[in-house]
From Swiss-Prot:
Membrane topology type: Lipid-anchor; GPI-anchor
Record keywords, A-Z: Cell membrane, Glycoprotein, GPI-anchor, Lipoprotein, Membrane, Signal
Residue ranges listed under propeptide: 406-433
Glycosylation site positions: N59, N72, N125, N159, N210, N275, N282, N323
Protein name (database record): Uncharacterized GPI-anchored protein At1g61900
Signal peptide (UniProt feature, chain positions): 1-26
Originating organism: Arabidopsis thaliana (Mouse-ear cress)
InterPro entries: At1g61900-like, SPARK
Amino acid sequence: MTRRAEFEMGLFVILQSMFLISLCSSQKPEEFLPEISPDTSPQPFLPFIAPSPMVPYINSTMPKLSGLCSLNFSASESLIQTTSHNCWTVFAPLLANVMCCPQLDATLTIILGKASKETGLLALNRTQSKHCLSDLEQILVGKGASGQLNKICSIHSSNLTSSSCPVINVDEFESTVDTAKLLLACEKIDPVKECCEEACQNAILDAATNISLKASETLTDNSDRINDCKNVVNRWLATKLDPSRVKETLRGLANCKINRVCPLVFPHMKHIGGNCSNELSNQTGCCRAMESYVSHLQKQTLITNLQALDCATSLGTKLQKLNITKNIFSVCHISLKDFSLQVGNQESGCLLPSLPSDAIFDKDTGISFTCDLNDNIPAPWPSSSLSSASTCKKPVRIPALPAAASSQPRLHDEGVTRLVIFVLSMLLVMLLS
């Protein structure tokens, strides 16, 4: 056995031992939580332990397929492989909002679009959709993905059907929609400009609205039907766009929505309100309360740069409603990285890029993904002139991709640091020890 192999085996044994010790500890569950005990706070969705960091676990068993699904999954092997990496076992809940679920949705859209070239239909019937979704889940699990994607991403067999959209026939679709206008707007999008100008998104909305009007029965609120028709429009687009750009386009459109919303759940703020009011008379107590509160947020999920800005704005606005007028983000040195899952300590906070990105598999190091470990951007305190954290009118400049810091090692081009599975394995053990 080589020295490297000995090291890997020893490390794996240490990790497993630490995990077992943590389970046998007499420490009460409440002691794992931050100082604040929220009334309705979510339990941190963290797996107990990751697979061996150096030798990633893959379910090598052949998936048991139904044989009743007509979709050609083998024609989308690369897409499915990327999806399995983005939804890798224990990391799927942590990457769900930014990587896993958007990639899974794009994969389903593209596969259904490809199938329409043979069937002339942009949706499956209910029976087939159940078999096909089950088969895809089996294939993904066989490649290392989580077996709980239906819950993590709220994916149901109805997502493969037309749902309430009245048009699924390709010929009928093309005779109803201004396809030239749709293609012109979506043929080649800039992922940054599109989120502000919304040219492609508006074209998709127009097309979805047009085909939704073909329904025989009218609805008081047509928004659900239009959303269902948007899925049909995206499947048609997947057949017309350059194959090398389809995934990037769909992921780019998804990221426009992702970056507009803070995915964190904010528990009550009684401790902060009690310690940070009265013109900040007790700065030490205030910052201790803020640190305790933020430590709870740090156990929820990984988020992007722009989501962190949304979260900072949301939290700051809530604090202002408690009559906290001082910029306690500045006083207590709260940065944007403090709103995301932490890796060991606050200096290693992980903010994902605001542009679409994928996890990468390496046979030696396992699963890695790009984290912004270099940009220490202070969390902005909301001002009266800033009514909202608009994606296009951010109060601070945030790089779409991580910027290189001279004080940190350049492990890859452009100073991008890859956070490998080993680091997160250690994090998970520390959180539970």
